[in-house]
Amino acid sequence: MRVALVSALCLLTGVCAASNYRDIQRAVSDDQLLQSAGVTPADAQLRKPCSAAVVESDDPPEFFDCVYVQTEKDLNLFSLEDGYLMSELQLKLHNMDGVALQHMGRVSQVQIFSHDRVTALYIHDKSWIDTAQTESVYRWLTDHGVPAREPRSWIGP
């Protein structure tokens, strides 16, 4: 009985996670959702599905699926809640203290530093972390004036 219950819960969790990820994939290209979140679609230079965690002080990281939106002057992380994009983080480039690229095996993580907060993020492709796109976010930020700095140890799983 317990094995059946645990198996059912694991299956349900997997189905919910896959469903949320598909919803994020659709939200990435939805101009109307982006407009209602306060970003003009024409201003979005890059829109990608991602996972991120915003860590303050020594709190444990809590990753969430999100839409990464980059404009000329800022970056935005939006979660998808009840069919709407909700702002989890908005940072102007000039308010960033630095950015780092952390590697673990074949995957990369962008770490963005702003005051006492560190944001760790990965860009996703259709199946897993897209290291090339994650690294291109890092390069874009440094090319646009965000200072490079040493990364913290790997954040998250």
Task: Show the residue positions of the predicted features.
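Phosphoinositide-binding peripheral membrane targeting modules
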Residues: 61-110
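Anionic N-terminal interaction surfaces
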Residues: 16-70
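Acidic, Ser/Thr- and proline-rich intrinsically disordered linker/docking segments
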Residues: 98-157
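Bacterial N-terminal signal peptides
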Residues: 4-14
